[in-house]
Amino acid sequence: MYLPGMGPKRKDILNRELHIQTWGELLEYYPYKYVDRSRIYTIVELSVDMPFVQIKGKILSFEEFVNGPRRKRLVAHFTDGTGIVDLVWFQGIQYAAKTYKVEREYIVFGKPTVFNGRYQFAHPDIDDASTLQLSEMGMQPYYVTTEKMKKAGMQSRAIERLEKTLLEKLPETLPETLPPYIVEPLHLISRDRAFRQIHYPKTANEMQQARLRLKFEELFYVQLNILRYASDHRRKYRGYMFSQVGRFFNTFYTQNLPFQLTNAQKRVIREIRADMHSGRQMNRLLQGDVGSGKTLVALMSMLIALDNGFQACIMAPTEILAEQHLTTIKEFLHGIDVRIELLTGVVQGKRRQEVLAGLATGNVHILVGTHAVIEDTVQFARLGFVVVDEQHRFGVAQRAKLWSKSDNPPHVLVMTATPIPRTLAMTIYGDLDVSVIDELPPGRKPIQTIHKYDTQMASLYQGIRQQILQGRQVYIVFPLIKESEKIDLKNLEEGFETLRQVFPEFRMSKVHGRMKPKDKEAEMQKFVSGETQILVATTVIEVGVNVPNASVMVILDAQRFGLSQLHQLRGRVGRGADQSYCILVTSYKLAEETRKRIDIMCDTNDGFRIAEADLKLRGPGDLEGTQQSGIAFDLKIADIARDGQIVQMARNEAQKIIDADPTCEKSEYKMLWNRLKELRKTNINWAAIS
C-alpha cells in the first residue's frame, strides 16, 4: 500500500529510530499525550503561565536576524487585532519563509514566552485557517520522536499526519480481534473505533474509551498466554504425590521448632502441602518480607519430601548465601538423622566426588548449592522437591534444567524477599501460584529509618560509636556507580580511611566488587563472626546475609539507590532482639522524586507498599527479574504499574476462557487461539514465553 508522505527516507528513519517496519506497527505507535485544541485565545489573553495555547490571526511581516555565520533567526510578526506576537524559527528557516504568507490567516499553536517585552512562540505549529475548522480539532496527539528524527524534519506533527493518512487509507472497518462475548459485557468499544479515537479523539472521553479498549486487549492476550502455558504445564507434568507426613517433619515440629509459627507461615505450609498431595507438579512463588520466616517454611516442606522417600535441594544465588543456608538448616535439624551437603564451585576434588556419590545413591537427603547444582554431572537418586532462593537471579531455563534431574519434575518452590506488586506478579510470574507470608514473627522491633543530611555526619558518627560500645555491629554502604568502578573504589578507599580515623578504636572489614571472591568471603566472614565491628562496602550487601548482632545500616548518598535497593539493604538489620536503625544520608538538595523515595522509606517498613511505590516511580522495565522471568513483555500502551484494575479484569476474562477450553479445541474460542498464535509469531514479543 502506498502512503502519501512516506518516502524511502522516512521509511528508513522510522525503521532505524522507532523500529517501525509495518503499517500495523505504525498504527500501534500511540501518542504519549494530548492537548485540547478546541479553544482559540486572543493575544491580549496570553500569559507566560499558560501551557500550550492557540491563537488565530494574520502574518504582518517577516524579519531575518543574523548573529554570526551559523546563527540565524526568522521572526514573523503576527496579529489577531488585539495585539502582536512574534513567531520565531531558529531551524527550518527556509521552509517557514517559503511556506507561510503575509496577510494569510493562520491558526498558531505553541507555548507563549516573553522576549524583549513581547510575547513569542518558538517553532509553533501552524495551520491554514481556511482548511482547519475548530470543530475538527479536538484533542491534538503528541508522539515521541528522537533528535535524529527532528533533524530530518520528522517531528510529532509529521507522525500525526502519517497516522491520519494511514487511517484514511485503511478499510472502513478494521477486523475485530476480541469476540462479542468479551467486548459487550465490559462495554468496550470496537477495535476500529479504538484505533481511530486513540490517534484522533475529539474529546477526553473518546481518548479514555480508546485507551481502555487497547490496554485491555494487550493485557488480555498476555494473560491468556500465561494462563494457557500454566494450564498446559499442569496437564503435561504429573507431579510426585506426597501422601504422608512422617518422622522427619514430626520430630522437627515437636522437638526442634525454634519458635511458634505465625498464622501466615501455617497458611503457606497448608497451601504447599495441598500442592504436594495433588499429584500435579507444584510451581509456587513464596513472597515474604525480610525476616518473615520463608526459610523455615521451605525447610518444613523439604522434610515432607524426605518423609515420602525423596531428596530435596535448595539453590541460592551466591556461595555465601548457600553456606548460610547450610548453617541455618544444620542448626534447625540438630539431632535429626538427616544428611545435608553443600555443592558450590569451591567444593572440589575428593569432597565433590563424595557429595555426587551420595546424591546418586540417595544417601544425601538435602543438597544446598548454587548454579553448580544444575551441572550435568549432578545426578539425584530421587529428587522430589526444589527450593529456588531469590528467583530473579535464575532464569526459567535454569529452573527447567532441574526438572531433568528426575523422572517426574520435582515440586518447585520459588522464594523471594523482594516483594512483587500483585499486578506485576500476575504478569511476570503468571505461571506460578503465589503464596505470601504477610506477618513477621512476634516480638521483633520495627526498624527505625532516619533521614540525615551529609552536613550532620558528626552526630551520626557519635550515634554509631554508642551502638558499637553497647556491643552492636554496623554496616556502612557506599553507592555503586556502574559506569565508573574506579571512582567507586577511590570513594570507598578514601571513605574507609576517613572512617578509620573517626573510629580508631574499632575493627573494620571492607568489601568491594573488585575483590577476589575468596577475599570478599573472608572479609564478610569476619563481620559475620563478630571479629570486626564495622563493615564498609561499595557493593550491595548480599540479600539474605544474616548477622543478628548488626543493628545499624548507614547508606551514604542514599539518593542514588532505588526504593527496592534501599529496602533490601535495610533488611540486613533488625534480625536480633535489639532496636535497629537505618540511616539514609543524602545531600541537602534533592529532586522531588528522590525526596518521595526517602519519605516512603521513613514512613513504612512494609515491603509490599514499598514495591508498589517503586513500581509507580520507576515502571516495570527497571525491576530486577522481568527479563529473566521468561515473559519478555514489551507493552505498547498498557502500564502494569498504573493499570492494575485492567490487569485484573484481563486476567479474569482470560481465566474464564482457560476454564471453558483448557485444551484450546472448542470452535467458539478459535478466534482467540488464532489471534494468540499470530501474536506469538510476529515481533509483538509481549506474548512470548520461553
Per-region residue spans from a language model:
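OB-fold nucleic-acid-binding modules
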Residues: 29-59
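Short, surface-exposed secondary-structure boundary micro-motifs
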Residues: 58, 111-112, 225, 558, ...
